[in-house]
Amino acid sequence: MKKLASIAVGWLMAFLLLGISPLWAQEEAGNYFTITGIVKNKDNKRKLENVNVSVPGTNIGTVTNADGVFSLKIKDTETILGLEISHIGYLNSQVSLKDKEDVSDLTIWMLPAPNLLSEIVIFGNNARGLVEEAIKKIPVNYSVDKNLLTAFYRETVQKRRRYISVSEAVIDVSKTAYSDREPSNDRVQLQKGRRLLSPKTSDTLAVKVVGGPNLSIYLDIVKNGDALLSMENLNYYDFHIEEPVNLDNRMQYVVSFRPRVSLMYALFYGKLYIDFEKLAFTRAEFSLDMQNRVKAVEAILHKKPLGLRFRPQEVSYLVTYKEQNGKTYLNYIRNEIRFKCDWKKRLFSSSYTVFSEMVVTDRKSDFAAIPSKKAFKEKQVFYDLVDEYWNEDFWKTYNIIEPTESLEHAVNKLKKQSR
């Protein structure tokens, strides 16, 4: 458990800016077409965030951004008939694409799922027993083979509401079978990345995430047996069954949990979503318990300058999984850290938000192992390994999470300031 409360939080380093030596690679572009669109709630027209957008019959997919916008790049050689759209609390939506024309600026409407509380049998009101059964079924419900995930990763740092750092990458994530719940056997390799940093002298305090892309390993709470979902860790929490919800046109148990004991390190509180029929974990929303600020700081902060005071405000996570061909796979991870910093001799503090997210865009089972010397290390800083290079066609055929309008605006400002 302590492993999750340190490495998986995404350790932060706060320090004065120094020069760095980046590394990055480039791939060849191929022939492809691009599908773009926006997903909205049909009832109230609200834009929907973190909606799964996938291509049935393939492993290709992405999620919508905070503006409800998505894009998918697909090879011309792929035969696709449409898209499948899924989101928690909504009925799945299908979009027909009989040809590859007119696939830009789609508007996709989703209907909220009806409340089916009366149609689902509560698990004997034994919330912990339900979680235990789902843990026992992990080797059956999740991949029994090794897999190589292609994923897009982004981390941003905001000082108040202003972006001061943006970095992105396409990564490979190799995972062993889920019957092996030991994360040290999984590896991450950077394929391609880029970064931007504010050149303002007022932003000389830099904030970086240690081990950022490795959240695909340590925050995969189903695969990582040292995280929340072990029989031993269950003893630290109280569990309660909440009202069920719909996800992927399937009913989900919702189990909330809170700390029931005090340990030497910070625990978590949140909700687990468990498929009604398969008893597979499909989603987890949880946050670091902030009741003891000293423990919270120990979980988050790796290094800071002398005289800097660090006050955590919130650390939250979202981890989602998606079923395909009878097995459930990692789909999306998000980590948000909010904190305040001030110097002992200054009157006012500055608020910061560090946001990291990763979406799996493709998956294959036939691949060469990632060599140890090329694997992203547990305590490496992702930002230091990529170059400051920000042309419009940088990602070529790679699928990404579309930047929000506010992020695009911030990137344009940072580019102008860096010239």
PLM feature spans:
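Bacterial Sec-dependent N-terminal signal peptides
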Residues: 1-36, 53, 117, 418-419
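Structural motif
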Residues: 30-48
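Short Pro-Gly-centered beta-turn/loop motif in secreted/extracellular proteins
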Residues: 45, 72-80
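Hydrophobic beta-strand segments
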Residues: 51-55, 68, 83, 122
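Short, acidic Ser/Thr/Gly-rich low-complexity loop/linker segments typical of extracellular
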Residues: 59-69
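A short, solvent-exposed loop/turn motif at the edges and junctions
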Residues: 84-95
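Surface-exposed, low-complexity/disordered segments
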Residues: 109-237, 248-251, 297-301, 305-419
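Extended beta-strand-rich segments in extracellular/periplasmic secretory proteins, especially
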Residues: 225-276, 280-288, 322-323, 328
